[in-house]
Swiss-Prot record:
Main function: Involved in the maturation of mitochondrial 4Fe-4S proteins functioning late in the iron-sulfur cluster assembly pathway. Probably involved in the binding of an intermediate of Fe/S cluster assembly.
Any GO CC annotation of this UniProt entry: mitochondrion
Localization per record: Mitochondrion
Protein name, per record: Iron-sulfur cluster assembly 1 homolog, mitochondrial
Description of how the protein assembles with itself and partners: Interacts with CRY2, but not with CRY1 (in vitro).
Family: Belongs to the HesB/IscA family.
Gene name as annotated: ISCA1
Domain of life of the organism encoding this protein: Eukaryota
Tissue occurrence: Detected in cerebellum, kidney and heart.
Transit peptide range per the UniProt entry: 1-12
Amino acid sequence: MSASLVRATVRAVSKRKLQPTRAALTLTPSAVNKIKQLLKDKPEHVGVKVGVRTRGCNGLSYTLEYTKTKGDSDEEVIQDGVRVFIEKKAQLTLLGTEMDYVEDKLSSEFVFNNPNIKGTCGCGESFNI
């Protein structure tokens, strides 16, 4: 059984110079540190899982959950000691995406900077590709 993590939003990125990488998803140092902090309180979990669900005004939304195991069709990204599993349904939507963690006075959230997005809703929680 998995538990929801925290809020996540998505940003369309234009004219981003893609860097060659073998991983479908890269993490910023801020995202790595936050995931490590969250997993410290959940020793029974091995990482976080990114999924995609149909919802919102633009069609798709990312989900983040704690996970205890790697699913058979999950892609695994290991970066700086953090394990992120990507559900099969989300793999193509995440190619070239950077996962960041942003905090300010009003909110804190994971942000997916995705160069493949064609549009987002006003709040940034749903997108289309």
